[in-house]
Amino acid sequence: MADDRKAALDAALKKIEKNYGKGAIMKLGEKVDQQISTIPSGSLALDVALGVGGYPRGRIVEVYGPESSGKTTVALHAIAEVQKGGGTAAFIDAEHALDPQYAQKLGVNIDDLLLSQPDTGEQGLEIADALVSSGAVDIVVIDSVAALVPRAEIDGEMGDTHVGLQARLMSQALRKLSGSINKTKTIAIFINQIREKVGIMFGNPETTPGGRALKFYSTIRLEVRRAEQLKSGTDIIGNRTKIKVVKNKVAPPFKVAEVDMMYGQGISQEGELLDMAVEQDIVDKSGAWYAYKGDRIGQGRENAKNYMREHQEMMMEVSARVRDAYGIGTGETVIEIEDAQEELPLDE
């Protein structure tokens, strides 16, 4: 009887593989590819917070937060890192607000960046699907989910109610996209805004537009918020920003990366490197003074950052020691994972 069941199972498996290709079904113990490669985020502190040294390939990432908190900056740094490694990047600008000059300052090669400014949400998501399905794009950024307006809403009159249209659009698109994203090992970053629920007395009233589907399909969700202003004298030169890993299916979540987002420069690599070097006792901090290998490098954090910027050899040496202390490489990495599974939502 047992032999009959085994023969029937073998026949069924062969039929499935014949119809749908090799690898369509397999025993979990036989699965060879239990590894996932990652792309650096462009921020050493964020790479550490993500737990795997960057964004995992073939996964969906949601970056959300208040206005002007640095969401697009986080995504542009990821694009710059992909391009540094010789990859291809696409930016779907549904908000029609991308600043090419700012992107260039962050290290993005705007000559090679694929840019689309869709008229409707359906068009934007169809373009994203076509790019992902091609298998020739390494990262696709959609900015933003809130700006992916359904065609019916654009064609309608001001004041018309379209209940759940955007949520259904996102749910349908993600069902289609998630498989091809995983198959082609493309990173999809969805930037999202926040809204407030009306009449909430207890708990967090904040929510993100586009329904619940994106929350479920995302492997990583990042919350970006400004913590404080950075000043040089009386001039405001940037913001201290907290990036919280709210959800992570490839490493422990709820870690926080604190970075300096400087106006016109993006994430300050010197600032985060200095903080992490002090934390690992690679750079000594005594009062307001910072010292490396017994030599003082600056009084006050901004002076120490400037010193590191002007002495690139020392900065590279400190960076190598910090990366070694945290166990993070300098480029694309491959890690072994145990991925948690989640129940996917019904249409909203």
UniProtKB/Swiss-Prot annotation:
GO terms for biological process: DNA recombination; DNA repair; SOS response. Its main location: cytoplasm. ATP binds at residues 65-72. The keyword Nucleus does not apply. One of its GO terms (molecular function) is single-stranded DNA binding. It holds the Pfam family RecA. InterPro entries: AAA+_ATPase, DNA_recomb/repair_RecA, DNA_recomb/repair_RecA_CS, P-loop_NTPase, RecA-like_C, RecA-like_N, RecA_ATP-bd, RecA_C_sf. It is found in: Cytoplasm. Keywords: ATP-binding, Cytoplasm, DNA damage, DNA recombination, DNA repair, DNA-binding, Nucleotide-binding, SOS response. Transmembrane segments: none annotated. GO terms for cellular component: cytosol. HAMAP family: RecA. PANTHER family: MITOCHONDRIAL DNA REPAIR PROTEIN RECA HOMOLOG-RELATED, RECA. Belongs to the RecA family. Can catalyze the hydrolysis of ATP in the presence of single-stranded DNA, the ATP-dependent uptake of single-stranded DNA by duplex DNA, and the ATP-dependent hybridization of homologous single-stranded DNAs. It interacts with LexA causing its activation and leading to its autocatalytic cleavage. This is Protein RecA. It comes from Enterococcus gallinarum. The gene is recA.
